[in-house]
């Protein structure tokens, strides 16, 4: 049956709407297969509970109160290979709030890395990431900023966002994560966190894509990024002059994913207070080598705020380590049926063949003393060996006489 013109126009309009909606929502059609918000995390083991595997960490005594993660806010600067995967992991872990910073767009050249999909090409990275993350976990509050933090005007906006964008309005974020790919942005993050005294993680992957690292920076306590800057920063070299036309850095989703995994693992340990947070953790893919170290702050750092934080940290009272004194416990058993005595570790060894009484430590005594040998010598029975040519009868006669 042929359609009327009005009906055809309506069909075309509906098709056009279906095509435009995913683009407006960051390339994700949120009307399909979504889930409702969850008010409280539950440990109930059912297929419909998105947090059952996470809450199991409490039952296994790894985390005391996992639901505290909903009270935490984390800022991620750079939503590329490492940053997008980091945001994805934290969203699946149920973080309370994510603040995303990036000014780049999704390109097909990004498809070798994780998270983004081809239909998101052309969208801003923060818009594409925010839409996907909201679809994965609608319980997470996501705030997006599409600007370059290294410019003068935008730096103030960035500073205000991390110092006022906490889970509680007007409070700073709990942690800042640097997932950028240039030193200029790292220095901007470093300056902001030193100024506002915020802890942050720096992360990165090498240009040849076979190594990566994370570094936990606590202003005044550990070295900031300006305390031991890379050669490019120390020599004030413009990074833009190092880029060549037609040449790009290598990128592997494996190295990106491993680095992001290390980063999120330490973020969770820091936020939920379990395990040991690494100050610096590296990764060499060629030899599967994982170096760890701690970098002390540079007293001659070029960042004036870093020097202020160092003075504040040194002025803090150091925690007093109290040595526990062992209580004088009563003996468990009043009787000593077997005559067991304790011997000091530094007591000389007793030679069982020696006739001398060994000297023992003060307060100790020997449990057994060897009897003295009698001065009277016992008669020794001398047995002469039979001659080689003795007969069997002679040997038997000798044995009978013994």
Swiss-Prot record:
The record's family statement is: Belongs to the ubiquitin-activating E1 family. UBA5 subfamily.
Gene Ontology molecular function, alphabetical: ATP binding; metal ion binding; UFM1 activating enzyme activity
Q: State what protein this is by name.
A: Ubiquitin-like modifier-activating enzyme 5
**Keyword terms, alphabetized:** ATP-binding, Metal-binding, Nucleotide-binding, Ubl conjugation pathway, Zinc
Write down the CDD domains for this protein, in alphabetical order.
Answer: ThiF_MoeB_HesA_family
Q: Which organism is it from?
A: Drosophila erecta (Fruit fly)
Species classification: Eukaryota, Metazoa, Ecdysozoa, Arthropoda, Hexapoda
| Location of the active site | 248
Which GO BP terms apply? Answer: neuromuscular process; protein ufmylation
Q: What are the disulfide bonds?
A: none
Q: One short Pfam family name for this protein?
A: ThiF
Q: Where is this region: Disordered?
A: 369-402
Q: Which residues form the signal peptide?
A: none
Q: Where does Zn(2+) bind?
A: 224, 227, 301, 306
């Amino acid at each position: 049956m042929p359609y009327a013109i009005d009906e055809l126009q309506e069909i075309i309009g509906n098709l056009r709407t279906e095509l435009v909606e995913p683009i407006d929502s960051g390339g994700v059609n949120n009307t399909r297969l979504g889930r409702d918000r969850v008010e409280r995390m539950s440990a109930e083991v059912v297929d419909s509970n998105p947090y059952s595997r996470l809450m199991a960490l409490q039952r296994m005594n790894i985390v005391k109160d996992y639901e505290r993660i909903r009270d935490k806010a984390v800022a991620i600067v750079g939503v590329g290979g490492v940053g997008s995967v980091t945001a994805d992991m934290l969203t699946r872990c149920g973080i309370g709030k994510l603040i995303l910073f990036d000014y780049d767009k999704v390109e097909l050249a990004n498809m070798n890395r994780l998270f983004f999909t081809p239909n998101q090409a052309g969208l801003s990275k923060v818009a594409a990431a925010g839409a996907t993350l909201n679809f994965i976990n609608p319980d997470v509050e996501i705030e997006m900023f599409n600007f370059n933090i290294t410019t003068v005007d935008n730096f103030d906006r960035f500073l205000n966002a991390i110092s006022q964008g906490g889970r509680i309005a007007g409070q700073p974020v709990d942690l800042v994560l640097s997932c950028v790919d240039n030193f200029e942005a790292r220095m901007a993050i470093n300056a902001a966190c030193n100024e506002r005294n915020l802890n942050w993680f720096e992360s990165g992957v090498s240009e040849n894509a076979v190594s990566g690292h994370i570094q936990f920076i606590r202003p005044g306590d550990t070295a900031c990024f300006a305390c031991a800057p890379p050669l490019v920063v120390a020599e004030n070299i413009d990074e833009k002059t190092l880029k060549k036309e037609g040449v790009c850095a290598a990128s592997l989703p494996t190295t990106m994913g491993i680095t992001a995994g290390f980063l999120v693992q330490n973020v969770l340990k820091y936020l939920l207070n379990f395990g040991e947070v690494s100050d610096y953790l590296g990764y060499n893919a060629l030899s599967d080598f994982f170096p760890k170290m701690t970098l002390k702050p540079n007293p001659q750092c070029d960042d004036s705020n870093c020097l202020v934080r160092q003075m504040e940290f040194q002025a803090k009272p150091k925690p007093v380590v109290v040595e526990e004194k062992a209580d004088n416990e009563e003996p468990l058993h009043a009787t000593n049926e077997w005559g067991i005595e304790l011997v000091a570790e530094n007591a000389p060894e007793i030679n069982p063949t020696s006739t001398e009484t060994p000297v023992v430590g003060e307060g100790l005594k020997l449990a057994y003393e060897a009897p003295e040998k009698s001065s009277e010598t016992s008669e020794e029975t001398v047995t002469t060996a039979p001659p080689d040519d003795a007969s069997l009868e002679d040997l038997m006669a000798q044995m009978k006489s013994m």
